[in-house]
Swiss-Prot record:
This is Potassium transporter 5. Pfam families: K_trans (PF02705), K_trans_C (PF22776). The keyword Endoplasmic reticulum does not apply. Its main location: membrane. It is a multi-pass membrane protein. Glycans are attached at residue 355. The gene is POT5. Residues 1-60, 119-184, 240-247, 319-327, 389-419, 473-476, 523-785 are cytoplasmic.
Length: 785
């Protein structure tokens, strides 16, 4: 390179690609490379935290999952038959027909669909509606904010498959999705609908589970049952702050005992009353049931469906555990226990058709009644944990994707990533659960609402997994059709039945969903408008350099981090800042925090630098990339990493330019075309103290408020180190968002009132970014959107 900085343009890269691999003709279409795609730092392979998980850890997580995931589906036997036969049992054969429905619903939906298919659609070990959404966004540009960069696909956690001739169908669908704004909006709305329904489950599950268990004490009046239930709910939500791992280890033994009781009680009733109910294993009895009951049988499906409530928690809570752990615990413990207890209850009902309203407790052998009752109450409390944990997970994911107002997310386990607790949401859920319990008072009414929420999430999951099969897995079209037709038909049949009870309580989850969707949609809508405004009003690089190097602008010692959401271009806030303060730090960095559709980013891939102006200007751009499951580091740790990788970037650029001791004058007037991801030669990152070595010659680099021309890489890194010793200042825009005067009344209401109300009542941006208040300087500006 002879001491010259090597400039890379798009044509050179395209020619280089063609020479490297003529066969991969679809590469350009899939990745749309620009001039950064070849020179972007190649990252080490990351096989993911789940792949190397030991057998002991897997079994430990499987045990924990009993206490978090299966409480909901495990306590369904408390109320399924009572919710199905609301008008009593007219024919003993109806019991066999319903049992057959229950067995095949659990087998097909819970075991086959979720345990063996849906769990495979995880995002590097994370589950839930937003995990599916992020997975789709990673393979197709379906995000509503246009901040994707080609270098993002170089992250090890993207794990994209290289183009092959087998990708034609997937590529065609991907192209259509990327070019359709309507498809992007629909996918987003479906995603936040599923997320809202999961949060709604977190409200309804505790209410119905606790009420159903406490009602087992026949001597208690309804008012007392409701009062005791409310007290239990308060204790449950107060316990959440201790974290999922502690909750899991505390609750898992109880659920294990509960499942043991279910198996024992089920076998007891089978052998004592009527073992012939096992003929329900023949699916023909489902057909016979509908022939006899007709419309009433269809209505009863709303009660049958309750046997799989909580199934979605297996996927939503996946980030707390692992795929293998959930598969083991469900297949070996939960599934056999559930099938056994439902068979035993059916055997009891064939002899005691009049006891359907309290089937579970009446079928318990007398010596086991009180021990079972105590465990049932404990299990019902634990049942609530599944959807509470799921609600925390999906809110955390949606927050990192910019689709939820800022709230505090606490990671409760240093050992298991993905275990989170959100204080504000926890107490809001508690208040909502108490309100539902006091308003509905019985499990029958809550059950009507509960079914709608659960089955809607399942339908959404089926549709999104079908899309993943088409675009990502590239599954044979026959298997895709079978998956969609079989599970889609089952779930739509159940949905039609539960919607029949809309006026009897079914309106509640839809009301909750509408409110949450409106909140998330408003937040995302204004967030996109704000981003597009900054993109439209951004200032050019030349103007920014001219402003910063103007004789009227002083360069003060230190590092200034100017936060902007733009990953390309310079925010108009920069011009506003310069015109008002007339000073720029000796090392000035335009920094963007970007959340990618992966669950985590390794530290060596996190910082993405480039020069804004000439190399002696001390001006840089930095994109700091996080996964949607990560929190921003503490300030001291962030500053150490930032300075370390900034100096690595300077060394890298020096090496790429040929290692010359001086920078050619012509290069100082041009912005290099290539952004560079810093990949240090080792994984070492200093944990404390100074980073790098400082030379005495740097003492004169900053004089009289001006920057002296830097000639060597040592001088540049020394300047950065000296600036760090002077301290970092965090500069943030304090923008006031208003709608344009000519905007419609609806837009004015959304922007001026709804969004600003949410903004005032959520966490401030500097708190979300973990910025120390003592180092914060805010720049006020009004945006008219």
């Amino acid at each position: 390179m002879d001491g010259e900085e090597h400039q890379i343009d798009g044509d050179e890269v395209n020619n280089h690609e063609n020479k490297l691999n003529e066969k991969k003709k679809s590469w350009g279409k899939l990745y749309r490379p620009d001039s950064f795609i070849i020179e972007a730092g190649q990252t080490p392979t990351n096989t993911g935290r789940r792949s190397l998980m030991s057998w002991r850890t897997t079994m430990s997580l499987a045990f924990q999952s009993l206490g978090v995931v299966y409480g909901d589906i495990g306590t369904s036997p408390l109320y399924v038959y009572a919710s199905t036969f609301t008008d009593g049992i007219n024919d003993k054969d109806d019991v066999v027909g319903v049992l057959s429905l229950i067995i095949y619903t659990i087998t097909l939906v819970a075991l086959l669909k979720y345990v063996f298919i849906v769990l495979q659609a995880n995002d590097n070990g994370e589950g839930g509606t937003f995990a599916l959404y992020s997975l789709i966004c990673r393979y197709a540009k379906m995000g509503l904010i246009p901040n994707q960069e080609p270098e993002d696909v170089e992250l090890s956690n993207y794990t994209l498959e290289l183009p092959t001739t087998q990708l034609r169908r997937a590529h065609m669908i991907k192209e259509k999705l990327e070019n359709s704004k309507f498809a992007k909006i629909i996918l987003f709305l479906v995603t936040i609908m599923g997320t809202s329904m999961v949060i709604g489950d977190g409200i309804l599950t505790p209410s119905i589970s606790v009420l159903s268990a406490v009602s087992g004490i026949k001597s208690l009046g309804q008012n007392t049952v409701v009062g005791v239930s409310v007290a239990i709910l308060i204790v449950l939500f107060a316990f959440q702050r201790f974290g999922t791992d502690k909750v899991g280890f505390s609750f898992a033994p109880i659920i294990l005992v509960w499942f043991t009781f279910l198996i024992g009680i089920g076998l007891f009733n089978l052998f004592k009353h009527d073992i012939t109910v096992l003929k329900a294993l023949n699916p023909l009895y489902i057909i016979y049931y509908f022939r006899r009951t007709g419309r009433q049988g269809w209505i009863s499906l709303g009660g049958v469906f309750l046997c799989i409530t909580g199934t979605e928690a297996m996927f939503a809570d996946l980030g707390h555990f692992s795929v293998r752990a959930v598969q083991i615990s469900f297949s070996c413990v939960a599934y056999p226990a559930l099938v056994t207890i439902y068979c035993g209850q059916a055997a009891y009902l064939t002899k005691h058709t009049y006891n359907v309203s309290n089937t579970f407790y009446d079928s318990i052998p007398d010596p086991l009644y009180w021990p079972t009752f105590v465990v049932a109450v404990a299990a019902s409390i634990i049942a609530s944990q599944a959807m509470i944990s799921g609600a925390f997970s999906v809110i955390s994911q949606s927050l990192r994707m910019g689709c939820f107002p800022r709230v505090k997310v606490v990671h409760t386990s240093a050992k298991y990533e993905g275990q989170v607790y959100i204080p504000e949401i926890n107490y809001l859920l508690m208040l909502a659960c108490i309100a539902v319990t006091l308003a509905f008072r019985t499990t029958e009414k809550i059950g009507h609402a509960y079914g709608i929420a659960v089955v809607t999430v399942m339908v959404i999951t089926t549709l999104m997994v079908t899309l993943i099969m088409l675009v990502i897995w590239k599954t044979n079209i026959v298997w895709i059709a079978i998956f969609l037709v079989v599970f889609g038909s089952i779930e739509m049949l159940y949905l039609s039945s539960v919607m029949y009870k809309f006026t009897s309580g079914g309106y509640l989850p839809l009301t909750i969903t509408v409110v949450l969707m409106a909140m998330m949609a408003i937040w995302q809508y204004v967030h996109v408008l704000k981003y597009r405004y900054e993109l439209r009003e951004k200032i050019s690089r030349e103007n920014a350099i001219q402003m910063a190097t103007s004789p009227d602008v002083n360069r003060v010692p230190g590092i200034g981090l100017f936060y902007t959401e733009l990953v390309n271009g310079i925010t108009p806030l920069f011009s506003h800042y310069i015109s008002n303060l007339s000073s720029v730090h000796s090392v000035f960095v335009l920094i963007s925090i970007k959340t990618l559709p992966v669950n985590r980013v390794t530290s060596s891939e996190r910082f993405f630098f480039r020069y804004v102006g000439p190399k002696d200007s001390g001006m840089f751009r930095c994109v700091v990339r996080y996964g949607y499951k990560e929190d921003i580091e503490e300030p001291d740790e962030f500053e150490r990493h930032f300075v370390y990788y900034l100096k690595e970037f300077i060394h890298h650029e020096h090496f790429m330019s040929g290692g010359g001791g001086e920078v050619d004058e012509t290069d100082k007037e041009e912005e290099p075309n290539a952004e560079t991801t810093v990949v240090p030669s080792s994984n070492y990152v200093p944990s404390s103290g100074r980073i790098g070595s400082a030379h005495s010659s740097s003492s004169d680099k900053i004089r009289s408020g001006r920057v002296v021309q830097v000639q060597s890489v040592e001088d540049q890194t020394e300047l950065v180190e000296k600036a760090r010793e002077k301290g970092m200042v965090y500069l943030m825009g304090e923008t006031e968002i208003t709608a344009e005067k000519e905007s419609s009344l609806f837009k004015k209401f959304i922007v001026n009132h709804a969004y600003n109300f949410l903004k005032k009542n959520c966490r401030e941006g500097d708190k979300a970014l973990a910025i120390p208040r003592s180092k914060l300087l805010k720049v006020g500006m009004t945006y008219e959107l």
